């Protein structure tokens, strides 16, 4: 599908869904832009096929079902239920979630699978933090816009009931009660007015009338008044039309379950090319003009429309009221309906049809401010974010309305290779251009020139003009702004051009918010194919300034050349018919310049030699270049009146100003009157006394009616054509020169290599592009260039007998296409340069960030790794080193994550570079160097992080080993306490309770310190990065574990196999010696019992403190046994044995073994160590301590 057809299809679909489209365009286009950019990557064809067409089918199905109960009603809002005037109800893109409140929801059409869509209902979730969405089931579509549907939704909804639906307009997002949306409004409150209207006017369209005033209605219905009642609309411009019926549409009865929308019939009725206004629609309360409204819909029946289509046409120039140059009052063209050949050939958009009144400007004329379509697109961007958008308005006392009735005036969504271009000026179909060509032009005040249309009484035709080919310029078309203030320019900076670049640029994010209103010009160096024709002027101003208006600072402006400009001519002398160029040729092929001496204008005070010279000089520049080379043949008609003396002087001045422009003079008159002409140099003068003699030099078929020839010529139409053509060509030339200079600026040099230079060049390039796109001339062409060209083509169709008109129109068309191509080339060149500069800036920033991370690793990182290397030491030393390393590791991890992100960005940049062509990669040799830098940095980053992780693991392993050994020591001390309590040296048999305690300790040894765990700790120690680290500590823990096991096992064996009493009493002195050798003070009481020595006398203070950290004294545990105060059970057993008189002493050998085992040097016990978590080798729990039942004081032996 070619781009124009794609644009037309998209715009027709949108206009059909959301009429009137001019009212909904800001919102809908904003949503389309966001969806096209986010979901379809700027691919307009995929957007159309995969989303818009299925969405259109679905929405039409919903609309038909909603409208079915109102088949005989006339809707106040023709877009119901999808939109309410300018408020969009069913959205195409998600809204800003921050605007949702409890009880609010909105409906959105979302794409599903390929070429399928569904309607989603979206509202706040229960936590009010996210947006929940739920698809509307297909069976619910027929009842979607009913109160019952929402009640069914609320019955299944857990949160607050939904009651407000969010609608979007150019004013922002607003909640509307669902009851209001589901209750359509109808036009049924003024039936008597409508009936009176139909009786008085029959098939007259309702939208042409203002029903607010009975006097105006009576005046409109007057038979002798030839001005349609639309004049009352212009007269009542000061009133508010908010209570009228905007956008009427008739819903006719169709088949069962189907509603027929007869918009196409209404739209296809073209009132001689005039844009039909909506009935009484205005937004003056919002600062907008009725001329800004769109959407033609008639309240009459289809039969009335057909009757309108069958009415006899009246030529446009017969319907224009005569204008008086002295008093230029308001006038309106009488409108008649014409029906085009077929609705298929004339694709109109309902929403963009405008009313254009033919009205001469007056100094005291007051009009409401009119917003151009540029403002509509600005609002579309603001509405895309769901926020309030201020619409900037321009006062337009006398503006030319650009035609917005065509889809070509809308957004062009271009797929394929031309996406890199900016808005295109591509040709439109002839049928599509026909809607632009039939235009009743408002006079406009532009560039200091006030236009004034003139009637043409000689033009009388009753058949409509055939459609003529037309062109279009992008979708930014509307009213030409006469001036743009700096404040306006700043407001427009982020306007539609950003959207344009995002749609047309190969890289959507490359568009850099280019402005729309600026002050830049350049030298005029475009193709000099045609002179600049006439500018419209007001009759009260005899002359207007030549050239274009001031546009602020220029790049390098040069004068357009020595050719006379139409702006230098007086309007009166130009229209006076004293000289004209009908288009005929003499027999030598030279253009005929007809000079009449009978016109009364020769006597007017404004008809001076200077003015006539300007006129003749300008006319000499009109013919084609090949005809100008032959020179002109001036035919002077002096049959009734001899020429004025000033004519000869004007001819001489013209010949001097434009050398060789006049080659022959054919003087039709008396010979005596031509004597003065003989003085002209290099000019052949032929005096002809009759028309028959003239036929020898000029074929009679080449003579106009004033010389009794059949050659068709209407001077007024010819003047109007060149008055429109000349400023249009001047703008095209200037725009072409500006674009060409900008293209050369972007393509002249390679981007700089350094990051700072690239940043400066990037900023300058953006400023240059912004200045170009803010040029008022270029903006004017974007808004109304296509419409102007279409009007020129329409006017040229009535002047197609003139080869000069045809050549100028062809030149304008070619220049228009050239500007379009230059605009495309400029955007491509700008994108290319900006891409290169952005790549270099990104490379520089990435390199700087990479160097920063690399420097941190080399300096701070390496220093901390070296200073916090794991070493053998006490528990406090290891814990301190571990805590410091954890703080350092947080910094290292942050740097590592930053390095990973930089590596990811570098990889993406490399992938982008690899995806580019060989030529582009060759332009960036630094990409190869950056790739090697990125690989080296990634390797360094990985190595550093692995080293930090390894060192962290070593510290955690060492810390875990210390804590494991500490728990082993506590358990060993508990075993010593147990042995001291049991007094195995004193009794020959151990009670069953003591045996159970020994068994429990063995079970604790097996559960808390199993062999598997001991082996795992050994493997962890062996895995340390430095050989020998922690080995000594591990060996001591292993030996301690073996000692505990052997001690418990021997004690259990001793309790099960007691020794003979004699064996215990054989060598009491030896036990005492052994105990004394261990530093233990053992005393025998009077009853012969062995007392337990105090715990402090076990020699624990003499333990080396290399690995076992000091702890608090164990006084709080109160495990010291005082002499003479043994545990209760042991005392009772001893007393029982004393009572029996069988006192036995322990075996000295066994006592010596127990003493040496129990009284090994032990460190003071510490308080409970807090558990540390987070490491890979964290402690499994608190340190092993004696449980409550094992505590010597809290759990005495009697409790067992």
From Swiss-Prot:
Compositional bias per record (Basic and acidic residues), positions renumbered to this chain:
437-448, 1137-1153
Q: Name one GO biological process term.
A: axon guidance
Kindly list any coiled-coil regions of this protein: none
- Per its UniProt record, what PANTHER family does this chain match? RHO GUANINE NUCLEOTIDE EXCHANGE FACTOR-RELATED, RIKEN CDNA D630003M21 GENE
List cellular component terms (GO).
Answer: cytoplasm; extrinsic component of membrane; plasma membrane
**Positions with biased composition (Low complexity):** 420-435, 1160-1171
- Record's protein name: Uncharacterized protein KIAA1755
For region Disordered, the annotated ranges are: 282-302, 323-372, 392-491, 510-568, 1056-1200
Which residue stretches does the UniProt record annotate as biased composition, category Polar residues? 518-527, 1175-1200
Which cystines does this chain contain? Answer: none
GO molecular function terms listed in the Swiss-Prot or TrEMBL record: guanyl-nucleotide exchange factor activity
**InterPro entries from the UniProt entry:** Rho_GEF_signaling-related
């Amino acid at each position: 599908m070619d781009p124009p057809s794609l644009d037309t299809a998209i715009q027709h679909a949108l206009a059909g869904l959301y009429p009137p489209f001019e009212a909904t365009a800001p919102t809908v286009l904003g949503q389309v832009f966001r969806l096209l950019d986010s979901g379809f990557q700027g691919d307009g064809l995929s957007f159309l096929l995969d989303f818009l067409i299925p969405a259109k089918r679905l929405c039409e199905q919903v609309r038909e079902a909603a409208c079915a109960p109102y088949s005989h009603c006339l809707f106040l809002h023709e877009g119901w239920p999808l939109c309410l005037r300018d408020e969009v109800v069913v959205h195409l893109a998600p809204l800003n979630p921050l605007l949702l409140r409890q009880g609010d929801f909105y409906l959105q059409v979302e794409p599903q699978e390929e070429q399928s869509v569904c309607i989603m209902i979206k509202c706040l979730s229960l936590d009010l933090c996210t947006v929940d969405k739920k698809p509307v089931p297909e069976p619910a579509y027929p009842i979607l816009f009913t109160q019952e549907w929402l009640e069914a939704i609320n019955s299944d909804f857990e949160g607050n009931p939904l009651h407000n639906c969010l609608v979007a307009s150019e004013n922002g997002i607003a909640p509307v009660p669902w009851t209001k949306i589901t209750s359509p409004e109808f036009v049924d409150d003024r039936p008597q007015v409508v009936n009176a209207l139909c009786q008085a006017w029959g098939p007259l369209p309702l939208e042409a009338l203002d029903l607010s005033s009975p006097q105006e209605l009576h005046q409109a219905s007057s038979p002798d008044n030839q001005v349609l009642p639309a004049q009352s609309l212009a007269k009542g411009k000061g009133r508010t039309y908010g209570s009228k019926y905007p956008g009427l549409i008739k819903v006719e009865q169709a088949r069962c379950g189907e509603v027929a929308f007869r918009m196409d019939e209404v739209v296809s009725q073209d009132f001689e090319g005039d844009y039909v206004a909506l009935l009484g629609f205005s937004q003056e309360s919002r600062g907008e003009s009725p001329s800004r409204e769109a959407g033609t819909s008639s309240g009459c029946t289809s039969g009335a429309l057909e009757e309108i289509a069958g009415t006899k046409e009246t030529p446009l120039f017969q319907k224009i009221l005569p204008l008086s140059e002295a008093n230029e009052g308001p006038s309106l063209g009488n409108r008649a309906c014409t029906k085009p050949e077929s609705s298929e050939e004339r694709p109109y958009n309902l929403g963009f049809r405008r009313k254009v009144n033919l009205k001469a400007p007056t100094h005291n004329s007051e009009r409401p401010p009119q917003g151009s379509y540029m403002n509509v697109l600005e609002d579309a961007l603001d509405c895309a974010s769901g926020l309030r958008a201020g619409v900037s308005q321009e006062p337009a006392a006398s503006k030319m309305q650009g035609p917005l009735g065509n889809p070509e005036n809308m957004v062009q969504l271009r797929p394929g290779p031309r996406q890199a271009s900016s808005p295109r000026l591509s040709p439109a179909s002839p049928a599509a251009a026909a809607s632009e060509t039939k235009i009743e032009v408002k006079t406009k005040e532009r560039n200091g020139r006030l236009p004034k249309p003139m009637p043409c009484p000689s033009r009388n035709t009753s058949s409509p003009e055939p459609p003529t080919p037309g062109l279009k310029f992008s979708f930014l078309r509307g009213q030409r702004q006469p001036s743009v203030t700096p404040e306006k320019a700043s407001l427009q900076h982020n306007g539609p051009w950003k959207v344009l670049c995002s749609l047309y640029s190969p890289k959507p994010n490359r568009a850099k918010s280019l402005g729309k209103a600026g002050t830049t010009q350049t030298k005029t160096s475009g193709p000099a194919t045609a002179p600049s024709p006439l500018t419209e002027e007001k009759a009260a101003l005899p002359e207007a300034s030549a050239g274009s208006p001031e546009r602020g600072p220029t790049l390098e402006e040069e004068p357009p050349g020595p050719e006379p400009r139409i702006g230098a001519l007086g309007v009166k002398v130009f229209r006076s018919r004293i000289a004209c160029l009908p288009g005929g040729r003499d027999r030598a092929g030279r253009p005929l310049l007809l000079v009449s001496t009978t016109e009364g204008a020769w006597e007017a005070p404004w008809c001076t030699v200077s003015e006539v010279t300007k006129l003749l000089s300008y006319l000499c520049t009109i013919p084609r270049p090949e005809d100008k080379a032959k020179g002109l043949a001036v035919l002077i008609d002096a049959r009734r009146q001899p020429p004025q003396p000033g004519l000869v002087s004007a001819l001489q001045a013209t010949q001097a100003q434009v050398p060789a422009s006049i080659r022959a003079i054919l003087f039709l008159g008396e010979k005596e009157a031509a004597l003065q002409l003989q003085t002209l140099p290099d000019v052949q003068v032929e005096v002809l006394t009759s028309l028959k003699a003239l036929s020898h030099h000029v074929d009679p078929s080449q003579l106009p009616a004033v010389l009794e020839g059949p050659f068709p010529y209407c001077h007024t139409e010819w003047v109007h054509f060149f008055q429109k053509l000349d400023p249009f060509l001047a703008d095209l030339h200037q725009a072409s020169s500006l674009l060409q200079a900008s293209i050369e600026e972007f393509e002249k040099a390679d981007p700089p290599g350094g990051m700072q230079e690239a940043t400066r060049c990037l900023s300058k390039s953006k400023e240059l592009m912004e200045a170009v796109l803010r040029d008022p001339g270029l903006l004017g062409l974007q808004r109304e260039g296509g419409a102007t060209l279409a009007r020129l083509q329409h006017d040229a169709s009535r002047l197609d007998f003139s080869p000069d008109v045809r050549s100028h129109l062809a030149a304008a068309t070619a220049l228009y296409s050239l500007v379009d191509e230059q605009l495309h080339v400029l955007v491509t060149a700008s994108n290319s340069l900006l891409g290169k500069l952005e790549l270099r800036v990104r490379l520089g920033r990435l390199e700087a960030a990479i160097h920063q991370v690399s420097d941190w690793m080399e300096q701070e990182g390496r220093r901390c790794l070296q200073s916090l290397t794991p070493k053998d030491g006490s528990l406090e030393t290891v814990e301190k080193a571990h805590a410091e390393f954890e703080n350092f590791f947080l910094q290292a991890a942050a740097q590592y994550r930053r390095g990973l992100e930089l590596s990811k960005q570098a990889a993406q940049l490399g992938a982008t570079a690899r995806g580019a062509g060989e030529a582009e990669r060759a332009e960036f040799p630094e990409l190869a160097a950056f790739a090697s830098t990125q690989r080296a940095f990634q390797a360094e980053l990985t190595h550093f992080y692995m080293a930090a992780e390894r060192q962290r693991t070593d510290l955690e392993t060492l810390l875990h080993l210390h804590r494991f050994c500490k728990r082993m020591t506590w358990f060993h001390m508990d075993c010593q306490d147990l042995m001291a309590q049991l007094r195995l040296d004193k009794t020959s048999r151990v009670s069953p309770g003591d045996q159970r305690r020994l068994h429990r300790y063995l079970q604790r040894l097996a559960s808390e310190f199993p062999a598997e765990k001991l082996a795992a700790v050994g493997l962890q120690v062996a895995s340390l990065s430095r050989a020998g680290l922690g080995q000594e500590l591990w060996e001591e823990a292993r030996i301690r574990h073996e000692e505990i096991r052997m001690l418990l096992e021997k004690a259990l064996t001793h309790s099960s196999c007691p020794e003979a009493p004699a064996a215990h009493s054989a060598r009491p002195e030896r036990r005492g010696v052994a105990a004394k050798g261990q530093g233990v003070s053992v005393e025998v009481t009077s009853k012969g019992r062995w007392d337990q020595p105090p715990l402090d006398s076990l020699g624990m203070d003499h333990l080396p403190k290399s690995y076992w950290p000091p702890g608090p004294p164990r006084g709080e545990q109160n495990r010291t046994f005082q002499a003479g105060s043994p545990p209760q059970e042991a005392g009772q057993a001893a007393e029982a044995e004393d009572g029996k008189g069988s006192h036995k002493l322990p075996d000295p050998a066994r006592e010596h073994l127990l003493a040496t085992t129990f009284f090994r040097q032990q460190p003071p016990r510490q308080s409970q160590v807090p558990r540390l978590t987070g490491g890979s080798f964290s402690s499994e729990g608190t340190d092993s301590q004696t449980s409550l039942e094992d505590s010597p004081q809290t759990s005495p032996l009697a409790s067992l």
